[in-house]
Amino acid sequence: MNMSLSRIVKAAPLRRTTLAMALGALGAAPAAYADWNNQSIIKAGERQHGIHIKQSDGAGVRTATGTTIKVSGRQAQGVLLENPAAELRFQNGSVTSSGQLFDEGVRRFLGTVTVKAGKLVADHATLANVSDTRDDDGIALYVAGEQAQASIADSTLQGAGGVRVERGANVTVQRSTIVDGGLHIGTLQPLQPEDLPPSRVVLGDTSVTAVPASGAPAAVFVFGANELTVDGGHITGGRAAGVAAMDGAIVHLQRATIRRGDAPAGGAVPGGAVPGGAVPGGFGPLLDGWYGVDVSDSTVDLAQSIVEAPQLGAAIRAGRGARVTVSGGSLSAPHGNVIETGGGARRFPPPASPLSITLQAGARAQGRALLYRVLPEPVKLTLAGGAQGQGDIVATELPPIPGASSGPLDVALASQARWTGATRAVDSLSIDNATWVMTDNSNVGALRLASDGSVDFQQPAEAGRFKVLMVDTLAGSGLFRMNVFADLGLSDKLVVMRDASGQHRLWVRNSGSEPASGNTMLLVQTPRGSAATFTLANKDGKVDIGTYRYRLAANGNGQWSLVGAKAPPAPKPAPQPGPQPGPQPPQPPQPPQPPQPPQPPQRQPEAPAPQPPAGRELSAAANAAVNTGGVGLASTLWYAESNALSKRLGELRLNPDAGGAWGRGFAQRQQLDNRAGRRFDQKVAGFELGADHAVAVAGGRWHLGGLAGYTRGDRGFTGDGGGHTDSVHVGGYATYIANSGFYLDATLRASRLENDFKVAGSDGYAVKGKYRTHGVGVSLEAGRRFAHADGWFLEPQAELAVFRVGGGAYRAANGLRVRDEGGSSVLGRLGLEVGKRIELAGGRQVQPYIKASVLQEFDGAGTVRTNGIAHRTELRGTRAELGLGMAAALGRGHSLYASYEYSKGPKLAMPWTFHAGYRYSW
C-alpha cells in the first residue's frame, strides 16, 4: 500500500504537466493546479522531495492548501522549485525535513524548502528543519538565484540554519517568525561571483531569533552587495551580533527592536568553540562580546529603532568603511559601549577608510562609553537634529592592523544635539548650535564653536570636584558654562595650549559660599597675546558668589578671572611740587640706648566680625536676605497694623457710652531704603477684627477690648524677584475718652511673622529662603480735641510706639548662610487734626477731617549677616505724613470710617495708604 501511494505521489507531476500542455495547445491559459491540496506527503528516501517543480514541468500556478509534508532522507527537500515560470502557493500547511541537506563536496546549500527558480507564496504555513545538526544542515528556507522569489506571510520558519537568501534572490516576509537560526543574506566573498546581482529581502513586523545552539553568528547576517529592509518587528540573539552587515551590504532598519535575548555571556556557544577563536563570517574574537549591530564596509540606517546591548559588547560596532545613520529611536548599553569602532571583518582587511556614525532626529544613546575606539582608524561621529548621547569618548592604544592606516577621531555636534560625557581622545570637536556637557577633566585637540554652541562643565555632585578642559586650539564663538567653589578657592578652568581666537562668553553658576581668600578666581588661561576675548553671559555681566557680585577681567597675560564688582575708588590728587631741600648738615652719631625691660604679654583683641567692603554690590540672594531681615521691615508691617486710634475704632465720640465690635481693612504701598540692601517696594494689605466693652467713669469712659488680624506684605526686588511676609497678630487695647476732649489710647500686640523670598540669581536660577520670627510691641497715643460751637474742631496728637522683633537663622537654597539678629524700633509722632462735625437728619452725623504729622524713628536698626558678613540695616530718620478721612454715624449703632494718607521720608516713603472700617455699637 505504501508503494502504491508513493507511485501516485510521484506520478502526479507528470499528469499535471501533460494537462498543462494540452490546455496550451487549445489556447487556454495555464491552470491553477490543486493536486497537492489537503494531502499528507511522507517520504524517507535520499533526495525524495515532497513537492518538486522542475524546469521541465511548465509554467503555471500550483497550490497546496492544507497540506502536510514530511521528508527525512539525505538531501531530501520538502519543497523544491526549479522552474522560473512556476509559482507555488502553499497555505495552511506545514513542511518538515530531518535529513542531512548540506552537500560538503560542492559546498551547496539546501533547505527544507528550496527555491532556485520560480516563486513561492506561503501563507499561514510552518517550514521547519528539525535535523539534529546545526547551521548549514538546518536551513528552513533557502532562496538562491536571480530568478528565485519567495513571499511569506503569517508563517513560522524554524531551523538551526534559519533562512538563507543569496545570489540575487528576492524575498518578502510579513508578520512572521523566523526562529532558531536567524536570517542569512549573501555568501562569503570567495564563494560569490563579482557580477552576481544583489539579493533583496524585506521584513515587515517579523520576529527573527537566533539561539546559541544554532551557531548563527548573527540573528540577521547580510554579507556582500545585498540589501535588507526591516519595518517593524524584533531581532533577538545571535552568537556575536543581532544584525551584521559586511562587505558592501545595505541595511534599512525601521521600527525594529534588537536585543541579545538569553544568549550566554561572552558569546560562548554550547557544544564547543569555533576554531581560531573567530566566528564564521569574519567576526572578531568572541571576547569582544555581543553587538546589537555589527557593520563593516557597509551602510546601515536605523530609524525609530531600539538597540540594547549587554554588559560585554556594544549597541553598534563599526568596522572599516562603515556608514551608520541613526534617526530617532534609542541605543542603550548601560554597562558597556554604545558604539565601538575599529573591529569587524578582521579576516578581510580592506584599505582603511573613514568610519561615519551619525545620530540625528532625536536619537538617544546611553552607555558607559558613547564611543570606544579600539583601533586608530579615522572616525567621524556626528550628533545632530536634537540627538542626545551620554557616555565618554575613549580610545585604546592598541597597535594597528598591518596594512591599516591610522586617522583622526572627529566629533561634530549640531542642530540642538547634546552630548554628555568626557574625553581625552577627540582630535577635533565642532559644536554648532549644540551642547557638550563635560562630566570630567577632558582634552581636545581642536575645539570650534558656532551659533551659540556651548560647553557645559557639569555641576558636580560634591563640592570641590572642579573640572579642567584643555584644548590645543580654540576658535569660533560659543558659550562655556562653569562652576566656582568659592569657599575652597577653586573653579572650573578652560586652558588653551597653542592658539585661541574668537569671541566667547562665560556663564558662571551662582555660589552661595564666600571666597576663601582674596577676590579673584581664575577661569580661563590662554597663550599670551592670543586674539580670543571672553565676556560674562550672566545677567548684567556679573556673577553672584556668596554675598557679593563679581565681574570678569583680563590681566593682559592671557588670564581671565572673576574679580569683585567694586566701584572704582576716587582718584587721589596729584602731589604739588614744593621747594627743593638744600643740603643737610651731617647728623652726629646717636648714643647707644640702654636695654628695655621685657614687656608683659598683651592680650590680643578679638577679631571683629567681617564688615561689608565699601562700594561692593550685593548678590541677589544676599540683597533679598538683607531686605527681608532686620527690624526695619518687620516694624513697617507692625505700624501698618497699629496706626492711629481713629483708623482702628473710627470716631468713638460719635457713639458715646457704647461698647461694640468692629472690623477694618487696610492697604499700603511702601518704598524702603535701609542703607544696606538695594531700594525696594512693598505692598501691605490686611484686616483686623476686634471688640470692646465701654466702662463709664467720672469725667469720661474706658473702652477695654481685644483684637486679632492678618497682614501680608509683598516685596519686589527690582530685577531680581521678590518675597513676602505673612503676619498673624493678637492683642488688646485700652482707650480712655474724657468728656473734656482728652483721650488716651494704649495697645499691646504680639505677632508671628513668616518671611520668605524667591529671587533669580545672575545665572537665571531661582534662589529661595524662608524663616519665622516673632515680634511684640506697645503703643501709647494721647491728644485733646478743642471743639467750636459750629462743629469745627482742632485736635493735637502725640504718639509713641516701641516694637521689638526677634531674629532667625537659615540657609538659602544656594547655600548662603543668613542670620537675622532682629532689633528694636522706637517711633514718635506729633500730629494735628482739623475737622468738622456735621449733623444730618435722623440723628446721623458725618465728620470729615484732615491731618498732618511728623514722625521720628529713634532706633530702627538691626543686623543681618550673610556668611558671617554683617550688614547694618536702619530706618532712623524723620518723615512727614498728610492724611484726610471721614467718620460717619449712620444711626442705631452703625458707623463707618475711611481715610487716605501720604508719607514721605529719606528712607521710608508711603505713596498711598487706605483704611476702611465698620463699627457696630451696642
Swiss-Prot record:
Signal peptide extent: 1-34
UniProt region (Disordered), positions on chain: 561-619
Residue span, Autotransporter domain: 654-922
Gene3D superfamilies, A to Z: 2.160.20.20, Autotransporter beta-domain (2.40.128.130)
Site (Cleavage): N643, A644
InterPro entries in UniProt: Autotransporte_beta (IPR005546), Autotransporte_beta_dom_sf (IPR036709), Autotransporter_adhesion (IPR051551), Autotransporter_pectin_lyase_C (IPR012332), OM_autotransptr_brl_dom (IPR006315), Pectin_lyase_fold/virulence (IPR011050), Pertactin (IPR003992), Pertactin_central (IPR004899)
Region feature 9 X 3 AA approximate repeats of P-Q-P, mapped onto this chain: 575-603
Cellular component GO terms, alphabetical: cell outer membrane; cell surface; extracellular region; periplasmic space
Pfam families from the UniProt entry: Autotransporter, Pertactin
Intervals holding Sequence repeats: 266-270, 271-275, 276-280, 281-285
Record key words, sorted: Cell adhesion, Cell outer membrane, Membrane, Periplasm, Repeat, Secreted, Signal, Transmembrane, Transmembrane beta strand, Virulence
GO BP, sorted A to Z: cell adhesion
Region of interest (4 X 5 AA tandem repeats of G-G-A-V-P), residue spans: 266-290
Pro residues bias: start-end ranges: 568-613
Motif (Cell attachment site): 260-262
Notes concerning its domains: The signal peptide, cleaved at the inner membrane, guides the autotransporter protein to the periplasmic space. Then, insertion of the C-terminal translocator domain in the outer membrane forms a hydrophilic pore for the translocation of the passenger domain to the bacterial cell surface, with subsequent cleavage.
Role according to the record: Agglutinogen that binds to eukaryotic cells; a process mediated by the R-G-D sequence. Pertactin may have a role in bacterial adhesion, and thus play a role in virulence. May contribute to the disease state of whooping cough.
Note: Synthesized only in the presence of low Mg(2+) concentrations.
Quaternary structure note: Monomer.
Protein name per UniProt: Pertactin autotransporter
Organism of this sequence: Bordetella parapertussis (strain 12822 / ATCC BAA-587 / NCTC 13253)
